[in-house]
Amino acid sequence: MPRYYPVFIDVTERTCVVIGGGAIGQEKVEKLLESDAEVLVISPVVNQKVRDMADAGQVTWEQREYKPGDLAGAFIAIAATDDNKVNRQIAAEAQERNVLLNVVDVTHLCTFIAPSVARRGEVTIATSTGGASPALARTFREKLTGSRILEYADLAPVLASARAELREASLVVKPDHWQTQITEELLDMVQAGQTDEARKMLMDGLMEGASPVAAS
């Protein structure tokens, strides 16, 4: 089994091809749209939700079977078909064109796999089992989604603001000291709407460990 390199990919305004228009294809399309991709769906038949997205101009739908050449100009491609022959053809073209490819539930044909994702605010936590057990990855996601730990995502705006202020002042704080300031008390204050007080407490704590950026 490959040892996958974990990475987040910016697909904004990039052409992403989804081959297949059933429930799984629909799920892939929706996730790509959430990331502002330009989505092309190729399938002779699509479900109503995909059809509605096409009618609304959210995606481009070509109502036909896949044919070689369909991945020209694609940034990534997703094969959501149950046709092994077609999947192999898509994989061959993707390899030839250096297009990143996910073939749903056919790990050995993939050059990337889609993790199970838990999101809150600006924080995204992706979990993968390398294709060994998607059910286990979903279990991680569900447990994270219902846990206190994911609520720490609510701190992201305050932490980003503090980071920007330190950068503006040409100050640096070591990672270990940063982590000591990310506390339950800080989270409670932010969730109670005491954002200004939380930010002040955070900055006071960070300044205790801040030092000037070394001259280059």
Where are the regions that the model predicts?
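Hydrophobic, well-ordered beta-alpha structural blocks that scaffold small-molecule cofactor pockets
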Residues: 1-45, 50-53
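Residue-level detector of alpha-helix initiation sites
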Residues: 23-24, 84-85, 131
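Hydrophobic beta-strand scaffold residues
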Residues: 39, 61, 100-101
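ADP-ribose/adenylate-binding Rossmann-like module
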Residues: 76-82, 87-114
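Short loop/edge segments at beta-strand edges and connector loops
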Residues: 43, 61-65, 105
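Glycine-rich, highly charged phosphate/nucleotide-binding loops
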Residues: 52-72
